[in-house]
């Protein structure tokens, strides 16, 4: 919905709520993903998946018909709650339906669609916003969700869960409500620190310091609770201590964070610096989409042939950091050769890397642990995207103000130039336009450094991964 936000704020007069349109979704999604993973181990996947889908549809309905900004925020939170169970549920269905060798292509297709949706979303949202209404960004979910529900009801068998939930007391114990009580506010504190620090408030402001202290205290208590609860914890210590699991967690956090930092800010560069429409900015992101799609499917075939996913986890950070580094060098006068060519290695790196963590957890763990491990991996992906967007957006906002003061100090006299991203050529006098464009270009490329850093750090998560063959029958989990 990024390309729809300007129209939404125009209608609701709610520029102050922009951050909450994304944060309300990310908060419920991040914090409840693992809880859905627990539910998938206690109840038939079919029915829990349908509950998650129903929540997602209800949230979309609220967003589409809301008369005000508060309703949109509430709808986004409900949508995030539902989506927390959809992604991990889809992977769990595949893991229970076919042998590992046959899952590779299916997982790659899902991860590919996940990545393509993040890149193509601005394109589709731009088309709806430009030619229909921003509300169609949410209406479109309703028919597709209905068709999915029908397919699940009639085509998916309700298999027995790997564990029995028992009574309500046992269920609540497995869901680790005590742990969630500390995890949820900890994530809120973290995202607020990363969003506000250096942009809305200086880092030594008492509000930022208070949030940092709050996050530290809450996450420490959460860790203690996890150690105390053991197998009934939100994140069981015996799982996270396995090198393959903590390695894939780091890898997922970094590679997804890198993708989100670029898919969020590259369209801003196209629209503000190049002056194109929301629709065209989506079209200009097609090189990334093609690289991801082709290489995700190709890597699945190759992993099935050679049996090992580890080489692809090594190659993904290398290729993505090359592309990310090149994209961070874009200039105001960069042409198609640059912005197309630089996206290709970045898209290839994402394509061969995004699906591998889901393959790893299924190759090294026993069936009873797979649904929860999938949810943990999905949680790290969601958290990585949330953190990357928050940090990159904070960098962009703070650096734009500084750069504007250096490149075009008089520009804001002609309007609030730091918020008029898509109308710069209509708002800024011709003699000041070049300075304003340089300020925007520099601020965006500085924000892209977040994606460059995360792409390079993904190798830290890849190195601990063992060379386990998907073509050999696994007899035990990882040490």
UniProtKB/Swiss-Prot annotation:
It comes from the Eukaryota. Gene3D superfamilies: MFS general substrate transporter like domains, Multidrug resistance protein D. Glycans are attached at residue 416. Keywords: Cell membrane, Glycoprotein, Membrane, Transmembrane, Transmembrane helix, Transport. The keyword Nucleotide-binding does not apply. Disulfide bonds: none annotated. One of its GO terms (cellular component) is plasma membrane. It is a multi-pass membrane protein. It is found in: Cell membrane. The chain crosses the membrane at residues 47-67, 71-91, 104-124, 136-156, 177-197, 208-228, 250-270, 283-303, 306-326, 344-364, 372-392, 442-462. The keyword Repeat does not apply. InterPro entries: MFS (IPR011701), MFS_dom (IPR020846), MFS_trans_sf (IPR036259). GO terms for molecular function: transmembrane transporter activity. MFS-type transporter; part of the lnb gene cluster that mediates the biosynthesis of diastereomeric piperazines. Lna and lnb clusters encode sets of enzymes that produce overlapping sets of previously undescribed metabolites such as piperazinomycin-like metabolites or morpholine. The lna and lnb biosynthetic pathways appear to be part of a signaling network that controls the formation of sclerotia, a resilient overwintering structure. May be involved in the secretion of the metabolites produced by the lna and lnb clusters. Belongs to the major facilitator superfamily. TCR/Tet family. This is MFS-type transporter lnaF. It comes from Aspergillus flavus (strain ATCC 200026 / FGSC A1120 / IAM 13836 / NRRL 3357 / JCM 12722 / SRRC 167).
């Amino acid at each position: 919905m990024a390309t729809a936000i300007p129209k939404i704020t125009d209608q609701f007069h709610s520029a102050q709520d922009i951050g909450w349109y994304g944060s309300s979704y990310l908060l419920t999604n991040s914090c409840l993903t693992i809880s859905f993973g627990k539910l998938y181990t206690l109840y038939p996947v079919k029915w829990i998946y349908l509950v998650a889908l129903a929540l997602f549809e209800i949230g979309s309905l609220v967003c589409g018909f809301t008369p005000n900004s508060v309703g949109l925020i509430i709808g986004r939170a409900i949508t995030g709650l539902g989506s927390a169970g959809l992604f991990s549920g889809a992977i769990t269905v595949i893991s229970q339906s076919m042998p590992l060798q046959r899952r590779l292509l299916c997982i790659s297709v899902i991860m590919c669609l996940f990545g393509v949706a993040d890149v193509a979303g601005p394109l589709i949202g731009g088309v709806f916003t430009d030619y229909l209404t921003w509300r169609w960004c949410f209406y479109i979910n309703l028919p597709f969700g209905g068709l999915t529900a029908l397919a699940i009801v009639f085509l998916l068998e309700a298999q027995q869960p790997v564990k029995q939930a028992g009574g309500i007391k046992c269920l609540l114990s497995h869901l680790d409500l005590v742990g969630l009580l500390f995890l949820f506010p900890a994530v809120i504190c973290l995202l607020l620190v990363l969003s506000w620090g250096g942009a809305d408030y200086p880092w030594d402001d008492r509000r930022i310091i208070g949030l940092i202290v709050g996050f530290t205290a809450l996450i420490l208590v959460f860790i203690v609770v996890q150690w105390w609860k053991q197998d009934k914890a939100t994140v069981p210590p015996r799982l996270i201590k396995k090198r393959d699991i903590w390695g894939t967690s780091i890898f997922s956090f970094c590679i997804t964070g890198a993708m989100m930092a670029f898919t969020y800010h590259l369209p801003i560069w196209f629209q503000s610096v190049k002056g194109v429409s929301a629709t065209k900015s989506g079209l200009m992101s097609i090189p990334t989409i093609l690289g991801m799609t082709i290489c995700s499917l190709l890597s699945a075939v190759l992993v099935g042939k050679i049996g090992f996913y580890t080489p692809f986890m090594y190659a993904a950070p290398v290729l993505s950091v090359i592309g990310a580094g090149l994209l961070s060098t874009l200039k105001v006068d960069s042409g198609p050769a640059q912005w197309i060519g630089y996206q290709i290695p970045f898209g290839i790196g994402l394509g061969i890397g995004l699906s591998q963590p889901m393959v790893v957890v299924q190759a090294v763990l026993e069936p009873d642990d797979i649904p929860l491990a999938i949810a943990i991996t999905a949680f790290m992906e969601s958290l990585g995207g949330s953190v990357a967007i928050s940090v990159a957006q904070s960098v962009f906002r703070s650096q734009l103000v500084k750069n504007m003061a250096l490149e075009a100090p008089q520009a804001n006299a002609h309007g609030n130039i730091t918020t008029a991203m898509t109308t710069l050529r209509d708002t800024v006098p011709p003699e000041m336009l070049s300075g304003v464009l340089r300020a925007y270009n520099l601020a965006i490329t500085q924000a892209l450094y977040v994606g460059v850093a995360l792409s390079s750090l993904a190798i830290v998560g890849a190195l601990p991964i063992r060379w386990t063959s998907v073509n050999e029958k696994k007899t035990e989990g990882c040490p």
